[in-house]
Design a protein with these regions (language model features):
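PAPS-dependent sulfotransferase catalytic domain
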Residues: 85-187, 203
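PAPS-dependent sulfotransferase catalytic core
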Residues: 1-79, 181, 189, 193-206
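A generic local structural motif
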Residues: 74-82, 99-102
Length: 206
């Protein structure tokens, strides 16, 4: 298994899901840099919300990912691997993966896909609370344009992820420890424990 794919709309709290498996000893974290972080006090305390590379239109990598299924496996993997220099399983996360779940499943059948879901309204509300277009990493303005387009995009992305969870009979997990085990990686240290139910997040692995 080379990759763990993560798909979630803006505001789905998918970054917290990624963060709390990112510290598994089996994960390649060489895509991390201080420039690829974002901190905010939306949770009530200033903390790290975004870390590592985000792939997608108008982002640092994956600008063409809306058309992911029109590229070869080799082209996709070159873009996945570009920010990494280490070893281990690589977490590849993109908001637009929800449009391409069938292609990802067919092309990388041995790699888990993690689908992160909250209601459309909850996603938009949380994304706004976290800074909306003032979020400094990743940058959203060039692709999502304005709140109306962001709201529509969240609905589209969530719809794709929910359909995939139904189509592939996904397994719902309730903590990051369960997620790590289902994905076949070592469980991170106890300080990274996350209860998805308490966090109002639905996490499904297909």
């Amino acid at each position: 298994m080379k990759y763990i794919f993560v798909s979630g709309a803006p505001g789905s709290k998918w970054s917290s899901v990624v963060k709390n498996i990112y510290y598994s000893p089996d994960v390649d974290s060489s895509d991390y840099s201080e420039a690829r972080t974002y901190r905010h006090d939306a949770t009530g305390t200033m903390e790290l919300l975004h870390m590592g590379v985000y792939w997608g239109p108008a982002m640092e990598f994956g600008d063409w990912f809306e058309r992911l299924d029109q590229r070869t496996k080799e082209e996709c993997e070159a873009e996945f691997d570009a920010p990494f220099s280490g070893s281990g399983v690589r977490i590849i996360k993109s908001h637009v993966f929800g449009y391409h779940i069938d292609y990802i499943k067919k092309t990388w059948p041995d790699c888990p896909i993690v689908l992160v879901d909250r209601t459309d309204d909850a996603c938009l509300g949380w994304w706004v609370k976290c800074g909306e277009f003032k979020i400094t990493y990743p940058l959203y303005r060039d692709y999502y344009k304005d709140l109306r387009e962001m709201s529509a995009a969240i609905a589209r992305e969530n719809r794709g992820n929910r359909q995939a969870a139904r189509d592939y009979l996904g397994r719902v997990v309730e903590t990051n420890r369960q997620l790590a085990r289902v994905c076949g990686i070592q469980v991170p240290a106890p300080e990274y424990y996350q209860d998805y139910v308490a966090s109002d997040i639905k996490v499904t692995v297909i």
